[in-house]
């Protein structure tokens, strides 16, 4: 690393960055050279870094290269990858995205690698997302009914027994919940209205692993909704459909769109979600967030800017 850090080219880039003279254009780096250069910038800067590439394959390659050098490297896959893989794989990618969103909310030094598609997408407003992060510690007075409602809003499924991420169960004064950001689920027990104990447990044996003092429970989905926002969105979707039908004469196109919208509305009413819900965020929020809202004070590195711009 020392030869790179002491090189004239790197020192020039470092000088530009320290003076805030952006953007800085760098040419002639090989694929491995890019990762080595990004590593050097990370070592010499106090800021976290976002690397944006033209597609998910390249983002994954850079992520794997950087992970060889550094511990705090995260890969944010695009939603298209999540939607079009088989269920088992897309489930893992769903948790991977949520893990990175959690890291974006932490003020720690890190590198996040993503594609231009993921970077340009819209997200739940940051403050709304943060308001659904539950922090519970021993000695807190809590209302399990209120927590249960918030977990459902946050994408958790209520079941008799917790067996996987994104699930919770409630039996009297015992709440089991498996956040996507945790290796094991939590078992939270009350004495009256006060949290008496918090333990992690094994999903297969249901036996306790260890006692902990606090549990941080992140949402189990990206799009956070309430009954009110769903009703508002359905009203806007139906109005948009009606306006479209008045402008288009092709009956087949109108019928196909009507079936799609009504199917999404039905799923929204029953399950509070549907497969391509991220594309409909403007119906739910007047001002959906972008990654810029989540990534404050980051250094942005655009790999192959021409190809990213072409996307």
Where are these regions (language model features)?
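ASCE RecA-like P-loop NTPase motor cores
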Residues: 1-311
